[in-house]
UniProtKB/Swiss-Prot annotation:
Protein name from the UniProt record: Ribonuclease P protein component
Entry keyword ATP-binding: no
Organism: Bacillus mycoides (strain KBAB4) (Bacillus weihenstephanensis)
Gene Ontology MF terms: 3'-tRNA processing endoribonuclease activity; ribonuclease P activity; tRNA binding
GO BP field: tRNA 5'-leader removal
Classification via HAMAP family: RNase_P
Complex and partners: Consists of a catalytic RNA component (M1 or rnpB) and a protein subunit.
Family: Belongs to the RnpA family.
GO cellular component: ribonuclease P complex
Catalytic activity: Endonucleolytic cleavage of RNA, removing 5'-extranucleotides from tRNA precursor
């Protein structure tokens, strides 16, 4: 993911948590915050230390990033997203993870995602 599409700072994460809307399924919680003046979307990832070891957590983050790269044309611009992975993600394949991520994005009101 490009640098302009990432949320890295703690205060940016906190703003999305406090002011944004959340949607969830068994595998993910997605917080969404509208930012009209922003020309692109931004994504922040969070995988708890309760989920596996570092290898498993990094694998989950890589799969989420790859899914976002494939869906980038369908994700609404002008929004910040924070994606929190839950425990069931540790046993999922890439296809299952991507399908679950699409499901939770659709629940959050993104109409352009068709896959």
């Amino acid at each position: 993911m490009k640098k302009k599409n990432r949320i890295k700072k703690n205060d940016e994460f906190q703003a999305v948590f406090q002011k944004g809307q959340s949607n969830a399924n068994r595998q993910f919680v997605v917080y969404k915050l509208d930012k009209e003046k922003q020309p692109h979307f931004r994504i922040g990832l969070s995988v708890s230390k309760k989920i596996g070891n570092a290898v498993v957590r990094n694998r989950i983050k890589r799969m989420i990033r790859q899914s976002i790269i494939e869906l980038k044309d369908e994700i609404d611009s002008g929004k910040d997203f924070v994606i929190i992975a839950r425990k069931p993600c540790a046993e999922m394949t890439y296809e299952e993870l991507k399908k679950s991520l699409i499901h939770v994005f659709k629940r959050s009101g993104m109409k352009r995602i068709k896959k």
